[in-house]
């Protein structure tokens, strides 16, 4: 897939992001200062106003990041593919379960299907974004007491990552219409998922889950030995720690926003 390499566009995008995130950072710093000093003395409307500022600031931060990500996916070259372990990605999702249960009263369960290591080729950061978007979408469909399952399933041609929920379900019985509505709509998150999968050669589908709810499935071709040169490490301790922290931070923001509504 060929993409434009617009240096001027990239510079403008970076400047736009820097200005927006600097302004949001100042807003958050002042909000934290006020919350800290008014924790005991502020009346209920003031505390609610500060909480609203926190949530809407996080929402704006996420929207800007998603818009920038969408621009990059649509206009920039695909980054060099690297081996990534889907089992490690599944473990990161599992670590979110306590916060999700505490904040949203929704149970998240992960299941590896007996798979211990599963190497596929892709862009690790994009794979993490994909999983977070799918989990967030599943959580939005659920009320308190709902359930979300994230699992790996072995396929003949690869491995499938499934994110399922027992929430409100799809509105159309036609699978083609479901994919058109949910993967081609205005929501940035699902548009990002679609682009990530198309660029990497992964197959994304949305279907009704047996028993109610929705099943999002991504099928990954397994990486061959030729895809992973001996000098290319599947795991790097320091890099994994950085990625894990970033994944947790993104997830915390999503949970904060989901808690609002």
Region annotations inferred by a language model:
Residues 55-60:
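Short alpha-helical segment of the dimerization/phosphotransfer core of two-component systems
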Residues 137-139:
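Short helix-loop "hinge" at the ATP-lid/N-box region of the Bergerat-fold HATPase_c
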Residues 145-157:
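Short beta-strand/loop element within the Bergerat-fold HATPase_c
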């Amino acid at each position: 897939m060929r993409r434009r390499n617009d240096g001027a566009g990239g510079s403008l995008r970076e400047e736009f992001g820097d200005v927006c995130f600097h302004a949001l950072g100042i807003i958050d710093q002042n909000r934290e200062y006020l919350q800290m000093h008014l924790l005991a003395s502020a009346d209920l409307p003031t505390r609610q106003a500060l909480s609203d500022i926190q949530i809407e600031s996080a929402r704006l931060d996420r929207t800007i990041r998603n818009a920038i990500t969408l621009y990059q996916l649509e206009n920039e070259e695909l980054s060099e593919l690297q081996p990534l372990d889907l089992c490690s990605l599944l473990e990161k999702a599992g670590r979110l379960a306590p916060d999700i249960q505490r904040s949203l009263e929704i149970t998240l369960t992960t299941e590896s299907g007996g798979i211990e290591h599963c190497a596929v080729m892709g862009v690790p950061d994009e794979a993490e974004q994909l999983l977070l978007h799918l989990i967030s979408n599943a959580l939005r469909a659920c009320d308190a007491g709902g359930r979300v399952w994230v699992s790996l399933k072995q396929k003949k041609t690869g491995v499938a990552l499934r994110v399922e929920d027992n929430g409100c379900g799809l509105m159309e019985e036609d699978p083609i219409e479901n994919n058109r509505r949910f993967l081609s709509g205005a929501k940035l998150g699902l548009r990002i998922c679609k682009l990530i999968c198309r660029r990497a050669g992964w197959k994304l589908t949305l279907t009704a889950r047996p028993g109610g709810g929705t099943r999002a499935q991504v099928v990954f071709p397994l990486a061959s030995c030729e895809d992973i040169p001996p000098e290319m490490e599947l795991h790097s301790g320091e890099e994994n720690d950085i990625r894990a922290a970033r994944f947790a931070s993104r997830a915390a923001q999503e949970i904060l926003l989901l808690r609002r509504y």
